[in-house]
């Protein structure tokens, strides 16, 4: 990893230091996704079978996972994996349930009551990728809040393996969250199918889940068309660690590597006011990297990552807020005392014994988070992501008589005569 001294960098160099790996969507990628979506819309399941054969190397008679396949998955996974997923579900449920909104009502004027009521989104589509490895944890992170929200129907798509099966852990994870409509479908074609619907795949109101550049582009295109809403902008995974001189170098290095192994376009940053800590972390990175099965992937990510020396921890937080990381680890002696300095981050991990991996799997928070700086304005997935907040108002005759004049003045100022008339008629006055 490159080591930089923030105090010695020019403004342009500082901007470059915080620049994420280039992930421009090439024109050919955008056009390929648009063509694929159009094909799925026009030919439905026929197109899906051809595309799946081309990209996944398997021809499927049926996309739907059968009850027999669910049963086989149940029998295939190790008992300790099942128990770990059950434990994770319980904690994810506990955390997300605590944050649920029940709506509210308030009288804003005599005879005028305004309410906010909460309704589940009708049908949602979950995408669980399986590029370099299947991700049953993503099925848990999406399935639990969808269940708590009360969505009428939850659809899940995940890529098939070359033998036509689906990773059994993903199927068990789906079952544990109450998801039974699972389809063997991956990539941009899965997004197109869930957005527009085919004979086999129902169209969904909102789509959730991470994916590669084709999946990300497909989500953007279907959202722009109005076919389906999406959870948030997506991008490569990332972590920023702020560490003081008392941090454990081995812990910090392990956290950086746990994010770097996601993919070659991941980015990891360390900000510290200690030269000794930075040097020790670099040594640990070299030692630990050699032991990883995905060392080649992690090494590519580290090549575009940074170890940055800062003058003060306060400066580190200013840099972090500018970067707005997906994951922020505070490897500090008094991490909670610094929490108020955090303005933009997807998820924060406090202290030496809270690795980012806990949030990925089983602490209870959600690991589907905004990336690429989107944490400045977006939040991670929650139960509210699967719900609509509907406004309700009711006015009595006395209520409209009391506040109607306000509406009349504003309607006239905007030149909207019909608006004014709708109020005036009820008040029995001239518009």
Swiss-Prot record:
GO cellular component: cytosol
Keywords of the record: Amino-acid biosynthesis, Histidine biosynthesis, Metal-binding, NAD, Oxidoreductase, Zinc
Top class in the EC scheme: oxidoreductase
Biological-process GO terms, alphabetical: L-histidine biosynthetic process
Catalytic activity from the UniProt record: L-histidinol + 2 NAD(+) + H2O = L-histidine + 2 NADH + 3 H(+)
Residues annotated as binding NAD(+): 127, 189, 212
Oxidoreductase in keyword set: yes
Binding-site list for substrate: 237, 259, 262, 327, 360, 414, 419
PROSITE patterns: HISOL_DEHYDROGENASE
NCBIfam families: hisD
Main function: Catalyzes the sequential NAD-dependent oxidations of L-histidinol to L-histidinaldehyde and then to L-histidine.
Stated family: Belongs to the histidinol dehydrogenase family.
Protein name per UniProt: Histidinol dehydrogenase
Organism from which the protein derives: Xanthomonas campestris pv. campestris (strain 8004)
């Amino acid at each position: 990893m490159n080591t930089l001294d923030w105090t010695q960098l020019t403004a342009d160099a500082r901007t470059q230091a915080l620049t994420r790996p280039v992930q421009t969507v090439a024109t050919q990628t955008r056009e390929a996704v648009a063509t694929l979506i159009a094909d799925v819309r026009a030919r439905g399941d026929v197109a899906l079978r051809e595309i799946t054969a081309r990209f996944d190397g398997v021809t499927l008679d049926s996309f739907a996972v059968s009850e027999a396949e669910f049963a086989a998955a149940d029998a295939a996974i190790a008992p300790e994996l099942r128990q770990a997923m059950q434990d994770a579900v319980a904690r994810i449920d506990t955390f997300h349930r605590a944050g649920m909104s029940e709506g509210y009502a308030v009288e804003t004027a005599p005879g005028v009551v305004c309410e906010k009521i909460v309704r589940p989104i009708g049908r949602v589509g979950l995408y669980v990728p399986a590029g370099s490895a299947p991700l049953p944890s993503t099925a848990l992170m999406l399935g639990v809040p969808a269940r708590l929200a009360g969505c009428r129907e939850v659809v899940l798509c995940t890529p098939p393996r070359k033998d036509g099966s689906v990773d059994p852990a993903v199927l068990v994870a789906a079952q544990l969250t109450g998801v039974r409509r699972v389809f063997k479908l991956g990539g941009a074609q899965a997004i197109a199918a869930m957005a527009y619907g085919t004979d086999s795949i129902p169209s969904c109101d909102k789509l959730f889940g991470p994916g590669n550049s084709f999946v990300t582009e497909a989500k953007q295109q279907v959202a722009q068309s109005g076919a389906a809403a999406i959870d948030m902008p997506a991008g490569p995974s990332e972590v920023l660690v702020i560490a003081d001189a008392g941090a454990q170098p081995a812990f910090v290095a392990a956290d950086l590597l746990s994010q770097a192994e996601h993919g070659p376009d991941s980015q990891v940053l360390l900000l510290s006011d200690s030269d000794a800590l930075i040097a020790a972390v670099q040594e640990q990175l070299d030692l630990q990297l050699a032991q990883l099965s995905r060392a080649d992937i992690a090494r590519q990510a580290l090549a575009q990552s940074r170890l940055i020396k800062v003058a003060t921890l306060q400066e580190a937080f200013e840099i972090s807020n500018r970067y707005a990381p997906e994951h922020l680890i505070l490897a500090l002696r008094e991490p909670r005392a610094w929490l108020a300095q955090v303005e933009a981050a997807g998820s924060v991990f406090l202290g030496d014994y809270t690795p980012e991996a806990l949030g990925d799997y089983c602490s209870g928070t959600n690991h589907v988070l905004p990336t690429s700086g989107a944490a400045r304005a977006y939040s991670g997935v929650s139960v509210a992501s699967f719900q609509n907040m509907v406004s309700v108002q009711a006015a009595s005759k006395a209520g409209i008589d009391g506040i109607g004049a306000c509406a009349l003045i504003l309607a006239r100022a905007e030149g909207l005569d019909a608006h004014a008339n709708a109020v005036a008629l009820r008040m029995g006055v001239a518009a």
